[in-house]
Amino acid sequence: MGESDAESDSSSNSSSSDTSSGSDSDARSESSSSESSGREEEEAKQEESAKDAKKTDDTDRGEKRAKERDAGQDEQPTEQKKTPAAEPRSERQHISHSAGVEKQQEEAVAAAEAESEKLNEAKKVETPVQRKEEAEASSVTKELNSPKAQEENAARELEERRKDEEQPVTTNGSSKESPVEAAAETVKPPTADHIEEGEITDKDEDDLPTKEEKKAVASKSPPKETQRKQSRSPDGKRRRPRSSSRSPSPSSRRRRRSRSKGSRTRSRSKSPIRRRSNSLERRRVERQRRHEERDKRDEERAKEREKRHQKGEPTSSRRRDDSREKKRSPERKRDRSSSTPKSKSSKTPRHTETTETNADNETVTEPAAKITERQRKTVDVLTSRTGGAYIPPAKLRMMQSQITDKSSAAYQRIAWEALKKSIHGYINKVNVTNIAIITRELLRENIVRGRGLLSRSIIQAQAASPTFTHVYAALVSIINSKFPNIGELLLKRLVIQFRRAFRRNDKMVCMSATRFIGHLVNQRVAHEILALEILTLLVETPTDDSVEVAIAFLKECGMKLTEVSSKGIGAIFEMLRNILHEGKLDKRVQYMIEVLFQIRKDGFKDHQAVVPELELVEEDDQFTHLMMLDEATETEDILNVFKFDDNYAENEDKYKGLSREILGSDDGSSSGSGSGSDSDSDSDGESGSDAEKKAEAGDIIDSTETNLIALRRTIYLTINSSLDYEECAHKLMKMQLKPGQEIELCHMFLDCCAEQRTYEKFYGLLAQRFCNINKIYIPPFEEIFKDTYQTTHRLDTNRLRNVSKFFAHLLFTDAISWDVLECIQLNEDDTTSSSRIFIKILFQELAEYMGLGKLNAKLKDDVLVESIAGLFPKDNPRNTRFSINFFTSIGLGGLTDDLRRFLKNAPKSVPAINAEILANAGGNPFRDGSAPAGNTKVAPSSSSSSSSSSDTDSEDSSEEDSSSDSSSESSSSDSSSEPKKKRKRKDKDKKKSKKATKEKSKKTKNKKKKKKAEKEQEKEKEKQRKSKKEKEKDKKRKKEEKKAAKKKSKHRRKSQESSDSSGSEDSDKSTSESSDSSNSSSDESDAEPQAKIKRQEHVEKNKFRGRTQDSDEFNLEGPGSKNRFQPNGNGQRRRDNSTGRERNRENSSYDRERNRGNSSYDRERKRGNSSYDRERNRESSYDKERKNRNAVAHDRQRKRDRSRSYERPTIRENSAPREKRMESSRSEKDSRRGDRSSRNERSDRGERSDRGERSDRGERSDRGERSDRGERSDRGERSDREKERSRAKERERDRDRDLKGQRERKRERDDGSRDRSRRERSSRRSKGRS
């Protein structure tokens, strides 16, 4: 009986200790309530403890005796430990006996409760577990009072004291236990409530006992009636129950301690207070052991677990008593240590059961056993409530890296913390410039799993820095386009935040929330209806703060609302206008409303809806949330907290695939620490829908070309720092350019060369050296040549010259192939002035380097025939003539010999076709001024064949000979004029039959009539002027001729002799030239263009000093009004006769103008029409008369001016009569000299005009039929004006000369009148008389 009581007591104590250690967290959560109730119990029971002090002393004495008796009965504790299953019957007896004892104890507890409730019924609250403990303690004390138990206990105490002296004592005062016992005591499964945050537990362990287990336990336990019967002592006296609340007096504590020595066998180290006071390390060790040994649940463990749940924790009073045991005397400690064998013996049934279960569980391993102790420490440090001890960051990262199991809570918790940290860091770093980079980094993190963290971070960052609201809104718009659920969550939280702040009258939070919502409206994340609802809410019941918030909100999204819903914002502004008119608000708010109206009037120009740099999402890609102000109800704050994910690895892979689709192939650097995926069911659907969306940007491309700029800078500095090209090439070859950078080097050579003021051979040699070193540089230079030719119009003259010389150097050194010339098409349509200048300088440079012969031989090479087909075209005679004239004009006519032969041997029908093309085009194909010819239109009567051109030449020459004085020319031209006239008439008859020529002739006739009428009017006016001038001249001549008649006759004779001699020479030369030209025209009628080109070359040879030579002889910039010729050989062209031209150049500007006038009027005589010829002859005669009159008037004017200068009344009045005679004689002499010089000039002019007419006959014959009469009249008028201007200039010069002469003569006379002696005067008189 005593053994069973002891065993039941020990089992109950051990189970209670297990419960207390296992439910540590539950005790913490209820500590405050339990401690407060314990304190009330102590205060209420202090009075009761004083009354019961005497009774407890008696019971203590009885308990000592009962212990001694029971010591003898408990002799075989170890045998029961080894063979617990061998005696099932005895065990059942012990259980039934303990049940009876428990029944008696319950009766004692009920009596004790009745007494205690009388004192403090309201304060004391006892649990069923406390009642059971009280019952067990009272039953044990009752049994231990028997005499046999006292004797046995006394004997056993002696033996146990000896054993205790030999056993070493632990640090906490308890004796050592066997390893099996220690494992059984330390490995105690906790209750379901004792789970710390982040603790790894088994789910099966936390389950409550099932109904079947409860039924089995209830069937095994004895009924309450038997317990009540056994609760009384053998003598029939009811025993006093042990009170749960103990008195604070030391005597009562000693009595209770001594009374419970035999029953409370648990050592000090096993108390819950001791366990709680131990270090964290010990608790972790216990938890580890508990996880390792807990695998299966059998029936026995289910029973124990049911008991543990029923009993619960010990009361707070017992915990205080256990804590006070530390202060007890060494005797109490020795007494307690002496009772440890009994406790060991009392625990044997439980230990046997646990050893059986441990033996069975050794073969089973749970997943939780995979986590090492180091990993568990890391998790505890991260997840414990107190934070744990400080661990350096490096060590912490090392500990975290050792956790690799993604399915564990430790790994997921670490990943969650890293995700939170990375999202917060990215949000704090975002700005306008790096928003694209930050967005890509955020999309690499699992923002679907951490969408709550992302929304919270963005809202907090925006509230902290409202000036960056537009940046955060742009970031949200980008994320919303990919994950609309994130944008919706953030918008919900913002709306709820605004409503809460509006109810609390928190203006600052309202301002920040509305500002963010306004920018989300601008970015099309939120619908404009939400903005209008907020504005209506703020303005409906206006206050100072609400109107201020509304104004701030309107400034942010007013432009967008005006674009989207003008009526809605108009209604809001009307409400604001009414508020302003009421005037109930503060003055400051009224001013703010007025400012807002002004901003609206300006069109919100200072408050743009979206900054251009932040307009990153297309309108079609954006997802707009239509959310009303009352719809947002749930903020989903649970998303801000860590949540364990069973399918962590699967969701992580899903998000990685989604991130790759969004970001493209640039996902290799994604961080694994923050990766993960949301475990919600809706995330899969969202990922499926978002997977169809593509990335906004691909690979990162450096648009600034930083590396290219650095390379160009290095090449430029290397080129400029080198002394010669060899050193520069050596340095550049050391740079080890990457593949593809060769073309940049070639471009730098050309750019540096073009930048120079003049071409430097350094760059050509440098490029040549690179082409010779490596052939990889040849294709880039050839490509650059073609590109440069196509873009020559972008280069100025200096750059164009340097570039063309640069490529000329590469060509003549054969650094690049001559096949690059195939890109040049030398014709009128495909060239520009810049391209012609480029070709000109290129070939001139090649001719200078190679010589004309070598260059011609190179171009005639069979390999280059196809490449130079564009330079020397043979497809069209028009293009052929253009090429011939171009190269001839730049001084390289020798290159066109083959083209001339080709054009000479071409059939005659080709020029006719060319003439039709020209007639349809309506102008000269050489509009760029390739030869010095007049700007004339194609006459309808012009013939395209070379024979017709020769006919017109001979006819014009015959007509001119008939009007001139030279008989030799007329005889030579008349001989061949008659048959040619017949041919010409036939050609004219054929051409007149054409409709196009008739229409053109009509137009030209109308124009000619108009011009004739205008000319006649001008002529009449000129005649009137001339008549007036002639009258004046005649009066002057009569006076002057009487004085100088003799001297004029002498000078006339001399001038005639000189003019006859020079005229004969000129006539001989002109006749020879005209005969040569006529012969050449008659002999070579088929090759007229070639003859013209030869004449052009002859012109180039006969350059004379007075004329400024053009650089190219080919007008590359455009045609001049006077310098044009027709490519078919029939245009006007000016012959340059050496003798006549040289004399004309040497004469004064007046003579040149006169020759131009004569030639212009002579050209008008070239038409075959007789009426027109007569009119032309009449005009020429008028012109001659007018010129003569002008010359006479000019001479008279000069004489009049001189005679005025000589008339000095002062000198004549003061001087002697002899001096007056001298002055008159001088004036006569001067007048005679002027007359002679003027006559000489007139005679020279006539002779020159005759010579010019004879020398220009060939030229007139070429140009006669192509020049329009209107243009001739215009030229005549221009020549007249130029003549008048030149005459005015000459008059001014003469006047200046005369004034200077007068001044000098005056000075001489003044000096002579003073110093001359009478001798000199007499000698002068004698000379004058003689």
Swiss-Prot record:
Family of this protein: Belongs to the CWC22 family.
Name of the featured protein: Pre-mRNA-splicing factor CWC22 homolog
Q: In which residue ranges is the amino acid composition biased (Basic and acidic residues)?
A: 46-94, 115-135, 149-166, 191-201, 208-236, 278-307, 316-325, 1013-1033, 1089-1110, 1133-1195, 1203-1320
Record InterPro entries = ARM-type_fold, CWC22_splicing_factor, Initiation_fac_eIF4g_MI, MIF4G-like_typ-3
**Residue stretches of biased makeup (Basic residues):** 252-277, 980-1012, 1034-1054, 1321-1330
Indicate yes or no for the key word Transferase: no
- Subcellular location(s) of the protein: Nucleus speckle
| Native organism | Drosophila melanogaster
What Pfam families does the database record attribute to this sequence?
MA3
